[in-house]
């Protein structure tokens, strides 16, 4: 019996060893595979830059295999992320438009990152202290961290310095006010009879960009686009927004220094690079494109003010959607911390034009050298002193489109500004009604 038991034990141990050799522990089976949703078309420089970044991460983290999945625009990425959550197969991480986080949190579609921060032995305050204060408004909801700033932007004024000099203007002293910008645009607009051969200024207006530019102009006119403390209120039918939209429309229809109609962002940047527009308002994220493609000297400057200097934050944060499995969540958190480290944040900024959200990025030797050679990259960082959170509400996209649809009608000459803003406010209030019914209007 003893022999038999020893024999059986030996066989069992041998079997266990064989199993261990044939089926090693999970860590040895292979890396944890995670997807990262990235809002960009499949082709293009941003996709290549992200591919470089992800390859470097994978090479340095053999226990994780990250794959960048290119998901189109910010709006498209939100739609695809929500569909994947609903299907029970969310990506482990998403580069999500920073102003979508509130709506996602309301819908229970985000992972609260507080516990992951605590597991690292850190605190919310210490963790967020790495990033520029202006970015925290879109990352923190109800005192909890839901997003980590990654590639962020502000709008900038781009000026063709050569054309400015030709018009007798000094590009080293860019326009500071709406009045000065209007004067510059008049002087920079060229005509041959009734035909405009060079526009003074171009401002983008297509879904997403249009709302961001309206927020920008409203802020510089002293106003607030939305209630930063509550997701159920927007301020469309106000004097500050009326003044902003009226001035934008005046550039188009009264002064005729701006292309007619609503112009998408890519068309605006192409117009500037080709010399068809002497100035443009566009994202910091376009800076590398301008730097690499402009065949002329250019200048970037703060967005001019009417009442005050102010701009909204733009760009995206890294999030972990709700429903991600524990092992993938841990891997995603490792990826997020790596991507937002000073060194990688600095690299991404140099590659793309987005400013680095991690303040320590600007103390890295490579970034110091880069800024010495490319002082134009400093402007967006300097403008952060007057930056404010990006418009974020319940149903952010529909509420934004309630305004954008009306602004496009104005710029296309089909409505007057006041009429359009009254309609936008009415539509937005209707969109926000369900949220208000369950919050501010739900009384004891």
Describe every region a protein language model picked out.
Residues 98-156, 210-213, 217, 299-301, ...:
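Hinge/lid segment of periplasmic solute-binding proteins
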Residues 138-150, 155, 179-233, 277:
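Extracytoplasmic/periplasmic solute-binding protein
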Residues 114-131, 174, 192-194, 199-205, ...:
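Short, solvent-exposed loop/beta-turn-alpha elements that line the ligand-binding surface or hinge
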Residues 129-130, 298-301, 350-405, 409, ...:
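Long, aromatic- and glycine/proline-rich binding clefts that accommodate carbohydrate-like moieties
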Residues 29, 52-131, 166-168, 173-176, ...:
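Extracytoplasmic "Venus flytrap"/periplasmic binding protein-like
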Residues 32, 59, 163-167, 242, ...:
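Extracytoplasmic/periplasmic substrate-recognition and gating elements
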């Amino acid at each position: 019996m003893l022999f038999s038991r020893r024999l059986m034990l030996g066989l069992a141990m041998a079997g266990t060893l064989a199993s261990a050799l044939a089926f090693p522990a999970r860590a040895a089976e292979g890396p944890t595979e995670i997807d990262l949703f990235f809002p960009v078309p499949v082709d293009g420089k941003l996709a290549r830059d992200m591919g470089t970044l992800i390859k470097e991460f994978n090479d340095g983290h053999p226990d994780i295999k990250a794959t960048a999945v290119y998901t189109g625009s910010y709006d498209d990425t939100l739609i695809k992320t929500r569909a994947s959550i609903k299907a029970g197969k969310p990506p482990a991480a998403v580069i999500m438009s920073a102003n979508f986080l509130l709506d996602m949190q309301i819908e229970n579609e985000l992972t609260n990152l507080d516990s992951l921060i605590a597991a690292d032995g850190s605190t919310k305050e210490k963790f967020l202290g790495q990033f520029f204060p202006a970015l925290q408004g879109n990352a923190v909801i109800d005192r909890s961290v839901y997003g980590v700033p990654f590639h962020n932007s502000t709008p900038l004024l781009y000026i063709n310095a050569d054309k400015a000099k030709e018009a007798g203007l000094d590009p080293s002293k860019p326009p500071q006010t709406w009045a000065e910008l209007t004067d510059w645009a008049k002087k920079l607009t060229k005509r041959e009879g009734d035909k405009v051969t060079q526009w003074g200024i171009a401002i983008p207006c297509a879904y997403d960009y249009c709302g961001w530019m309206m927020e920008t102009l409203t802020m510089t006119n002293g106003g607030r686009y939305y209630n930063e403390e509550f997701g159920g209120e927007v301020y469309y039918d106000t004097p500050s927004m009326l003044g902003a939209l009226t001035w934008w429309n005046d550039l188009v229809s009264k002064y005729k220094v701006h292309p007619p109609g609503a112009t998408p962002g890519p068309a605006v940047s192409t117009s500037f690079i080709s010399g068809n527009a002497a100035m443009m308002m566009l994202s910091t994220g376009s800076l590398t494109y301008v730097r690499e493609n402009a065949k002329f000297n250019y200048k970037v400057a703060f967005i001019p003010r009417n009442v005050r200097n102010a701009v909204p934050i733009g760009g995206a944060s890294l999030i972990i959607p709700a429903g991600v499995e524990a092992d993938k969540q841990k891997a995603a958190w490792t990826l997020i911390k790596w991507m937002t480290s000073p060194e990688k944040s600095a690299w991404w900024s140099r590659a793309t034009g987005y400013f680095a959200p991690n303040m320590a990025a600007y103390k890295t030797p490579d970034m110091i050298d880069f800024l010495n050679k490319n002082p134009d990259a400093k402007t967006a960082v300097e403008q952060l002193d007057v930056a404010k959170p990006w418009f974020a509400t319940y149903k952010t996209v529909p509420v934004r489109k309630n305004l954008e649809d009306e602004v496009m009608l104005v710029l296309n000459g089909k409505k007057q500004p006041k009429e359009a803003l009254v309609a936008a406010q009415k539509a937005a209030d209707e969109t926000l009604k369900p949220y208000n019914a369950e919050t501010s209007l739900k009384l004891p």
